[in-house]
C-alpha cells in the first residue's frame, strides 16, 4: 500500500468511492478495495482520484477588453446617463442597432432597461452599475430576480462589492478591471498644492444622499465646522473641469455601505488625493465618525 501512495500521493479512497456509483453498487467500501479497483481498472479508465478545485477566497480580475473587446454596440441605462458619452467613447461603442449581435448593457435600473434586455436575442453582457445590484434595495432585488430568467447572459462585476452581491444572489459574474479615468486630465497634484476644502461625494443629483452616508457626513460637518465643504450633488461642472474642483480639496469622503466602480475615487487616486472609502483598495477605511475625523486630521497637516 505504501508503494501505491508513493505513485499516487493524492489518491483519496473515500472520494474515489463516493463519486462512482458503480463502485458502491459493487460493494467496494474500504481503502484496500478502492486501491485494488483503481490499480486494476480505474487508472486505465482515467477515473478521478481526489478533489482538485476547492473554495477559493482569492478573486483575480480580468481586463475588461478581454471580455467585451469584440463587441461593437451598447445600451446605457438612463440611471447612468452621466457616464454615457465617456463610456461609449472609451470603448468606441455604437448605439444598439441589432438585437441579434452581441451587446453590452451598462446598468439595469428601469423598466426600459429590462425590456431592452428581454427583446435582445443575441449574447448580452450586463455591466452592473452598483445600486442596481444592491439586493437590500427592493427595486434592485426585483430586478435581480427577473434577470435570472434571461438566457445567453454574461454578468460583469466592476467592483468586489458588486461581485460579492451578485454571488450572494446566485449569479456568477466575471470580475473585471474597469477604469475610464483619463490620466492626461487627472494628474498627480503635490500635497502642498491642494486646497483646504473637503470634498464629499453624495451623488450626481439631489435625492440619493442616503446612499452616500448622509447622516454620517452631516455629523462630520457639524463636528468639524472649521472646514469648508464641497458637495458633489451641488456642483454642476463639466467633467473635464473636475480636476480644478478636486485640487481645491485635501481629502474626499465617499461614505458608501455598498458601491460600484466609484469613478470619483479612481479620479482622486490618479491625482494622489486621499479618499475615505471602504469599498476600494485605495480608500482609507472607517467604521465610525471618529475614524473619519482622525483621517481628516492626519491629512490636513
Task: Show which residues each predicted segment covers.
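Acidic donor-binding loop of glycosyltransferase active sites
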Residues: 247-260, 273
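Active-site proximal beta-strand in glycosyltransferases
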Residues: 102-104, 118-136
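Membrane-proximal helix-turn-helix segments that form the acceptor-binding/catalytic region
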Residues: 134-155, 247
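N-terminal pre-catalytic "stem/leader" segment of glycosyltransferase-like enzymes
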Residues: 53-120, 283-289
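Short alpha-helical segment that forms part of, or immediately flanks, the ligand-binding pocket
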Residues: 243, 265-270
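Donor nucleotide-sugar binding/catalytic pocket of nucleotide-sugar-dependent glycosyltransferases
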Residues: 154-165, 171-187
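Charge-rich, low-complexity intrinsically disordered regions
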Residues: 1-60
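Conserved catalytic-core segment of nucleotide-activated headgroup transferases in glycan assembly
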Residues: 183-239
Amino acid at each position: 500500500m505504501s508503494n501505491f501512495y508513493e505513485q499516487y500521493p493524492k489518491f483519496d479512497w473515500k472520494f474515489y468511492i463516493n463519486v462512482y456509483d458503480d463502485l458502491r453498487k459493487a460493494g467496494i467500501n474500504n481503502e484496500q478495495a478502492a486501491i485494488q479497483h483503481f490499480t486494476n481498472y480505474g487508472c486505465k479508465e482515467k477515473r478521478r482520484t481526489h478533489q482538485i478545485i476547492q473554495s477559493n477566497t482569492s478573486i483575480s480580475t480580468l481586463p475588461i477588453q478581454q471580455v467585451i473587446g469584440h463587441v461593437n454596440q451598447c445600451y446605457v441605462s438612463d440611471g447612468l446617463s452621466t457616464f454615457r458619452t465617456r463610456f461609449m467613447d472609451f470603448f468606441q461603442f455604437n448605439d444598439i442597432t441589432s438585437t441579434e449581435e452581441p451587446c453590452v448593457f451598462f446598468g439595469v435600473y428601469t423598466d426600459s432597461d429590462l425590456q431592452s434586455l428581454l427583446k435582445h436575442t443575441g449574447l448580452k453582457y450586463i455591466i452592473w452599475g452598483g445600486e442596481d445590484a444592491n439586493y437590500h434595495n427592493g427595486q434592485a432585488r426585483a430586478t435581480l430576480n427577473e434577470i435570472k430568467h434571461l438566457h445567453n447572459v454574461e454578468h460583469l462585476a466592476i467592483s468586489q462589492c458588486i461581485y460579492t452581491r451578485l454571488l450572494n444572489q446566485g449569479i456568477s459574474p466575471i470580475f473585471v478591471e474597469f477604469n475610464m479615468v483619463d490620466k492626461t486630465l487627472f494628474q498627480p497634484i503635490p500635497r502642498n498644492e491642494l486646497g483646504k476644502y473637503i470634498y464629499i461625494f453624495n451623488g450626481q443629483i439631489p435625492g440619493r444622499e442616503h446612499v452616500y452616508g448622509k447622516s454620517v457626513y452631516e455629523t462630520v460637518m457639524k463636528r468639524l465646522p472649521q472646514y469648508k465643504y464641497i458637495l458633489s450633488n451641488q456642483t454642476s461642472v463639466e467633467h473635464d473641469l473636475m480636476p480644478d474642483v478636486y485640487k481645491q480639496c485635501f481629502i474626499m469622503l465617499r461614505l458608501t455601505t455598498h458601491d460600484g466602480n466609484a469613478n470619483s475615487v479612481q479620479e482622486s487616486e490618479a491625482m494622489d488625493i486621499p479618499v475615505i472609502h471602504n469599498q476600494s483598495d485605495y480608500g482609507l477605511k472607517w467604521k465610525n465618525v471618529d475614524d473619519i475625523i482622525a483621517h481628516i486630521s492626519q491629512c490636513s497637516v
